[in-house]
């Protein structure tokens, strides 16, 4: 689904009941006779320690997936036999109304959310007992450590705390049209914010000014929450993958790496762009940028339903090696295959090519193996084949991080491939990463990210602003 179509999709309700049916089907794949009730609790209101103010509220993603409800202190029951979904919301607290106004009513919640019934939270135990009495041998499925002490589950034949959480995680991999629409809209908002930073980068003196520009643009477009802490990294700071200081001077530095994106109604976007602060790439920066862009374009061309993500990641390393050979950082005379086999390219591209994206920036279902003895795959967050309907980031990068590269320079196994004298010309490049968000389709992919990444176009925007 192209991003331009998202407004029509988002006119409807978040498809919570469709998601509940998906979860039941996942459970049924291993338990054909599944019966009973799915039980979930939303995030509770929490107070800041030693303070009378509430913590920032963030809904539990497992609860949101089956409700679309962003209210705190709620519960959900889903009767598998009848496919009946009931949301329980807090009743009116007169003292709270003084400060916060009237809360959403049960009728308003029923009109807003894709559920069959809305009741109040003091009714949940009675409702659970009634569901259990209707099917005495049935099971209640819940998530461990997410059941309040006041909840009894009396009358159920069994309590299962093992299957619901992984079932939701599996179901979340393939997105509904509504979910894709939310991610697409978040991408468009984030893309506009990236453009605002491009237009301002030449006129600021500190990273924090660009950080503020990005936040302001997202908030003004209706997305006040970021999907993750923004990375606004000038110069050599861009070699730190998750740099979060965002308060260093920009003067005298070559490039800015901006990894920043908003979330919309609990759904994340995740975009990275790298561009010259002055408006013109240096030859060294342009060589690395072109290599990273080719890494992305060639791996994007491989994407379709059933592609093995490990293979796509390996190809990104091949292109990186070709680019580093062309730049002279890897010594001539060695083959791409030989350098690939040595894993020396991991010094410059140490992370995985991408990750699933959804309600979490690093979304569920990736089956990563962080104990993999092969350094090329240790931080690959998705393993195996990609299903149609999944949303994944494609974010190759090349970095010049002294802390990471120095051990390779001291190890003959790797140092024989690296020309240290040429490498010295590239430290100020810092790091280059380019990241888009794509939906996997049967025969290819749909790129949801609209932020500009053509080198000449970025230079033109910066120089003319």
Swiss-Prot record:
Alphabetized SUPFAM superfamilies for the sequence: Creatinase/aminopeptidase (SSF55920), Creatinase/prolidase N-terminal domain (SSF53092)
Superkingdom of origin: Eukaryota
InterPro entries: Aminopep_P_N (IPR007865), Creatin/AminoP/Spt16_N (IPR029149), Creatinase/aminopeptidase-like (IPR036005), Pept_M24 (IPR000994), X-Pro_dipept-like (IPR052433)
GO biological process per UniProt: proteolysis
Enzyme class: hydrolase
PANTHER family: XAA-PRO AMINOPEPTIDASE 3, XAA-PRO DIPEPTIDASE
Protein name stated in the entry: Probable Xaa-Pro aminopeptidase PEPP
Source organism of this protein record: Pyricularia oryzae (strain 70-15 / ATCC MYA-4617 / FGSC 8958)
Organism taxonomic ancestry: Eukaryota, Fungi, Dikarya, Ascomycota, Pezizomycotina
């Amino acid at each position: 689904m192209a991003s331009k179509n998202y407004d029509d999709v988002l006119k409807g309700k978040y498809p919570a009941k469709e998601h509940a049916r998906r979860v039941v089907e996942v459970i049924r794949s291993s338990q054909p006779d599944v019966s009973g009730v799915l039980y979930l609790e939303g995030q509770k209101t929490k107070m800041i320690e030693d303070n009378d103010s509430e913590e920032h509220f963030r809904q539990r993603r497992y609860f949101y997936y089956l409700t679309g409800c962003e209210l705190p202190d709620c519960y959900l029951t889903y009767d598998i036999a009848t496919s009946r979904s009931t949301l329980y919301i807090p009743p009116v607290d007169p003292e709270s109304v003084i400060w916060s106004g009237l809360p959403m009513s049960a009728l308003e919640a029923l009109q807003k959310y894709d559920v069959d019934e809305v009741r109040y939270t003091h009714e949940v135990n009675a409702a659970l007992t009634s569901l259990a009495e209707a099917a005495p041998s049935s099971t209640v499925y819940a998530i461990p450590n997410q059941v309040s002490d006041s909840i009894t589950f009396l009358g159920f034949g069994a309590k299962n705390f093992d299957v619901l959480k992984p079932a939701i995680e599996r179901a979340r991999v393939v997105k509904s049209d509504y979910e894709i629409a939310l991610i697409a809209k978040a991408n468009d908002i984030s893309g506009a914010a990236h453009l605002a930073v491009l237009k301002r980068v030449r006129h600021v003196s500190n990273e924090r000014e660009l950080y503020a520009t990005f936040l302001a643009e997202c908030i003004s477009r209706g997305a006040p929450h970021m999907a993750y802490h923004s990375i606004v990294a000038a110069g050599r700071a861009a070699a730190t993958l998750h740099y979060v200081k965002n308060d260093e001077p920009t003067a005298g530095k070559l490039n800015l790496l901006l990894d920043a994106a908003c979330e919309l109604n609990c759904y994340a976007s995740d975009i990275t762009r790298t561009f010259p602060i002055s408006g013109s790439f240096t030859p060294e920066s342009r060589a690395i940028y072109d290599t990273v862009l080719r890494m992305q374009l060639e791996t994007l061309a491989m994407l379709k339903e059933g592609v093995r993500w490990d293979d796509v990641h390996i190809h990104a390393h091949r292109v990186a090696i070709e680019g580093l050979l062309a730049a002279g950082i890897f010594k001539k005379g060695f083959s791409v295959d030989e350098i690939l086999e040595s894993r020396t390219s991991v010094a410059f591209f140490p992370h995985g090519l991408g990750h699933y994206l959804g309600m979490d920036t690093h979304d569920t279902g990736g089956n990563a193996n962080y104990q993999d003895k092969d350094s090329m795959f240790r931080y690959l967050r998705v393993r195996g084949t990609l299903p149609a309907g999944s949303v994944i980031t494609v974010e190759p990068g090349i970095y010049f991080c002294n802390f990471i590269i120095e051990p390779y320079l001291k190890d003959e196994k790797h140092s024989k491939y690296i020309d240290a004298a040429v490498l010295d010309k590239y430290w100020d490049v810092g790091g280059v990463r380019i990241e888009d968000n794509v939906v996997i389709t049967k025969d290819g992919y749909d790129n949801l990210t609209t932020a500009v990444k053509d080198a000449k176009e970025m230079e033109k925007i910066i120089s003319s602003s």
